[in-house]
Amino acid sequence: MEIDEEEPMVFLDRTTRATRGKRMTKLLDDEVEEDEQFWNQEALKEEEHDDEYEAEREVADEFDSDFNDDEPEPDAVAVNEKELRDLPKKRLIYPGKTASKKKKKKTKVVSQLEYIPGDEKPGEELGNKEQEEKEENEAQEDMEGEKVIRKSTRTSVVVRQAERDALRAAIQATTKPIQRKKVGEEKRMTQEEMLLEAAQTEIMNLRNLERVLAREEEVKKKAIVHKAVYKGPQIRYHSKDGCNYLEFCNGASFNSELSTKSVPYPEKAVCVITGLPAKYRDPKTGLPYATRDAFKAIRERFMDEHDGLRKKMEMGDLFDTLVAKGFATKQKRTKIPKSNKSFSLRSSARFLSSESEEESEEDSD
């Protein structure tokens, strides 16, 4: 079914209360007060003569009044900036917040040691103290924000300072003042003294001059290098126009310098035992030998000629290798005593003979 007519709204009756809407009205009133307090601040008030803001005027090509004036001095500009900085700044206070109070700067009072003489009375002292306290309070109000130097009142610091002053005064008293000569107090020399001093300086200058000249001569001698010049007979070789020439100078001749005789060949060493061409030479005796047997014979003959040295003297490393004993591991070199007998080439002739003198003597016996 369609309802053509709307049903009327039914309102329920409520019991009235004494505190009904009390909180809401209080909140609304607080909001209105905060709103008025915010918009009535000094920062938001319009000033009658606002220097910072001026309405723009439609004026063309206008110059300021101070266009032709000189620029202000920097000191004056600095003073104006300082005054502008010192002006109190306007700040916005938002609703629901309280303005912050300025903190007063604490000033430190200079404490000084006071000396109280014995003649003053206690009543007068109290009066003087009160006056001094009043003056100090006034000075504190005038000197807000200024820094005051603090002095220590400890007795130890004062005593140390007094000791330093006394020590400094004692040092200054003991030090002797520097006596400076006056310009007019210089001693004037007589004519005789001046002549004597001139003679002494002349002698010293001559000695120094001699030393300098001697040093220069030594340096010059060292600088000059004398090359040795050959002045004997010379043969010079010249090549000119495709021809070679020999020039004999200073007593040189063709026959004297160019000899046609052949140089004889050096004689070949022969083994003293076998007579064959020697390839080796004994380092101890200096005799040439060709074979190992010849070397053994030379050493044995050498040991036989030197009586009593066979036991004291070794045959040597070379002899050991030839005998096939090999080198000793660690052997000290034996010292050979000096003897007046010398092994000559004449003794080598005995090796060629089949029998020596000793053997013939033994046969005769």
Curated annotation (Swiss-Prot):
One of its GO terms (biological process) is cell differentiation. It comes from the Eukaryota. Residues 43-83, 95-147, 333-365 are annotated as: Disordered. Residues 123-150, 184-225 form a coiled coil. Residues 99-108 have a biased composition (Basic residues). Pfam families: YL1 (PF05764), YL1_C (PF08265). InterPro entries: Vps72/YL1_C, YL1_N. Residues 342-354 have a biased composition (Low complexity). GO terms for cellular component: Swr1 complex. Residues 118-132 have a biased composition (Basic and acidic residues). The keyword Iron does not apply. Keywords: Coiled coil, Developmental protein, Differentiation, Flowering. Residues 48-74, 133-144, 355-365 have a biased composition (Acidic residues). Component of the SWR1 complex which mediates the ATP-dependent exchange of histone H2A for the H2A variant H2A.F/Z leading to transcriptional regulation of selected genes (e.g. FLC) by chromatin remodeling. Component of the SWR1 chromatin-remodeling complex composed of at least ARP6/ESD1/SUF3, PIE1, SWC6, SWC2 and H2AZs (HTA8, HTA9, HTA11). Interacts directly with SWC6 and H2AZs, but not with ARP6. Belongs to the VPS72/YL1 family. This is SWR1 complex subunit 2. It comes from Arabidopsis thaliana (Mouse-ear cress).
